[in-house]
Curated annotation (Swiss-Prot):
It is an enzyme of class 3 (hydrolase). GO terms for biological process: proteolysis. It comes from Haemophilus influenzae (strain PittEE). Presumably involved in the processing and regular turnover of intracellular proteins. Catalyzes the removal of unsubstituted N-terminal amino acids from various peptides. Belongs to the peptidase M17 family. This is Probable cytosol aminopeptidase. It catalyses: Release of an N-terminal amino acid, Xaa-|-Yaa-, in which Xaa is preferably Leu, but may be other amino acids including Pro although not Arg or Lys, and Yaa may be Pro. Amino acid amides and methyl esters are also readily hydrolyzed, but rates on arylamides are exceedingly low; Release of an N-terminal amino acid, preferentially leucine, but not glutamic or aspartic acids. The active site is at K275, R349. It comes from the Bacteria. Its EC number is 3.4.11.1, 3.4.11.10. Binds 2 manganese ions per subunit. Its cofactor is Mn(2+).
Length: 491
């Protein structure tokens, strides 16, 4: 889809004009102008009750006298001054649904006149594009009959505001990153294994002059002492690979980088502590942390942000086997701490603890890890907010600000010293689980033992990384949050 922002005349020929109307006869400037061009036809529709402004209600008019546009699509925007981001996205989805039923190739949107509560025109345009791209997403790679695609090619926003071009640029890059994350995450685990993740990282680096790649294989991990990471991989014939993408684009090439670390369990059966069969297929999504880091790196490369950023995809697979690690094993991690394994299904933190130690070599400005880490986080927060744990208030607040800006929501969980008590082991420095209570927090507390040398935050996306049911599939979260956080670091 090609997106543009420019002033257009209502008399201009096009396939379709999209116009918003509020409830209680609150009309926009363009509504009144079109009403004059059509000799009061729109007001007649209002008086007859056909046009009410009810949220997401649409009416499609064709070949109106006085308009060169083939169609006029009017959409209800609810009460003026009360339109939220969520409602606005419903409006865009309603517009798309109606347009899909026509052969519309070009649209001129006057929804730029619609006011979002506490938002400016930049967000009006950015939310529109991101919603369009997210709604139009299809993953039919393995279907013999492909999904019907929209014929819509051009979407023009009626404005010449300077912010509009920036909104289009940001939205295009973030949407591209989200799509990349969704595509990788939706791949079946017989194809998307750690080697496949590394191959995708290689392709991304080869297609960007600003990105470079280093792949750490099991032999190098063994030399580095990444025994916790390697233990998780022992039950699988698919070897572990940790892909390290480097984006070195700050004016000062030696500036400390921001590091993103993504959990990349391409399939998690739980190992010897085997998961129940129900919904186990969804454990292909246990690499959504790595997928979101991949998508974020793609987005910032497209935006050419003047930052130094490193993205780590910690690829691994957790399966039961005669060689698999066991409950009761004691592992020596890369930083020297020992961990007693009480549950092999608490494997993500074992992979991450060594990855978090590995990135110390970059002397990072800060580190954010992203992981589908705990079912406890889903129980606590549901499927709307990612869980945030951090030892740094400024970093946590910056991430929450980005979450609010993008509506890629997050909620901060506490991380006080008491939670470390639950991780005590009689045989090792730490246990890999902390008991029944506060599981999302104790998982974060476990990771905090490996982040003493830098500012750190942890995002648990177990509830937000994918959807179940009829709309089953990866969401691409939190690419939007992470990219916005990085955009904000430039300001």
């Amino acid at each position: 889809m090609k997106y543009q922002a420019k002033n257009t005349a209502l008399s201009q020929a096009t396939d379709c004009i999209v116009l918003g109307i509020y409830e209680n006869n609150k009309f926009s400037k363009s509504f009144n102008e079109i009403d004059q061009l059509t000799q009061g036809y729109l007001n007649d529709l209002v008086k007859s009750g056909e046009l009410t402004g009810k949220l997401a209600q649409t009416i499609l008019l064709r070949d109106l006298q006085g308009l060169s546009a083939k169609r006029l699509l009017i959409v209800g925007c609810g009460k003026k001054g009360e339109l939220t981001e969520r409602q606005y996205k419903q409006i865009i989805q309603a517009v798309l649904k109606t347009l899909k039923e026509t052969n519309t190739r070009e649209v001129i949107s006057y929804l730029t006149e619609i006011e979002l509560k506490d938002r400016d025109l930049y967000w009006n345009i950015r939310f529109a594009i991101e919603t369009i791209e997210h709604t139009n997403y299809q993953f039919d790679h393995f279907k013999s009959q492909k999904a019907e695609t929209s014929v819509l090619e051009s979407f023009i926003f009626n404005t010449d505001c300077n912010q509009a071009q920036q909104a289009i640029s940001h939205a295009n890059a973030i949407s591209s990153g989200i799509k990349a994350a969704r595509d990788i995450a939706n791949m079946p685990p017989n194809i998307c294994n750690p080697a496949y993740l590394a191959e995708q990282a290689k392709n991304l680096a080869e297609n960007s002059t600003a990105l470079s790649l280093k792949v750490v294989d099991e032999e190098e991990m063994a030399k580095l002492g990444m025994n916790a990471y390697l233990a998780v991989s022992k039950g699988s014939e698919n070897r572990a690979y940790m892909s390290v993408l480097t984006f070195n684009n700050a004016p000062d090439k030696n500036a400390k980088p921001i590091v993103l670390v993504g959990k990349g369990l391409t399939f998690d059966a739980g190992g010897i502590s085997l998961k129940p069969a129900a919904d186990m297929d969804e454990m292909k999504y246990d690499m959504c942390g790595a997928a979101s880091v991949f998508g974020t790196m793609k987005a910032i490369a497209q935006l050419n942000l003047p930052l130094n950023v490193i993205g780590v995809l910690a690829g691994c697979e957790n399966l039961p086997d005669g060689n698999a690690y066991r409950p009761g094993d004691i592992l020596t991690t890369m930083n020297g701490l020992t961990v007693e394994v009480l549950n092999t299904d608490a494997e993500g933190r074992l992979v991450l603890c060594d990855a978090l130690t590995y990135v110390e070599r970059f002397e990072p400005e800060l580190v954010i890890d992203v992981a589908t880490l705990t079912g406890a986080c889903v129980v606590a927060l549901g499927q709307h907010n990612s869980g945030l744990v951090s030892t740094d208030n400024n970093l946590a607040n910056a991430l929450l600000q980005a979450a609010t800006e993008t509506t890629d929501k997050a909620w901060r969980l506490p991380l006080s010293e008491e939670y470390q008590e639950q991780l005590k082991s009689p045989f090792a420095d730490l246990a890999n689980i902390g008991g029944r209570w506060g599981g999302a927090i104790t998982a974060g507390a476990f990771l905090s033992n490996f982040t003493k040398k830098y500012r750190w935050a942890h995002l648990d996306i177990a509830g937000t990384a994918w959807l179940q049911g009829a709309n089953k599939g990866a969401t691409g979260r939190p690419v939007s949050l992470l990219t916005q956080f990085l955009i904000n670091q430039v300001k």
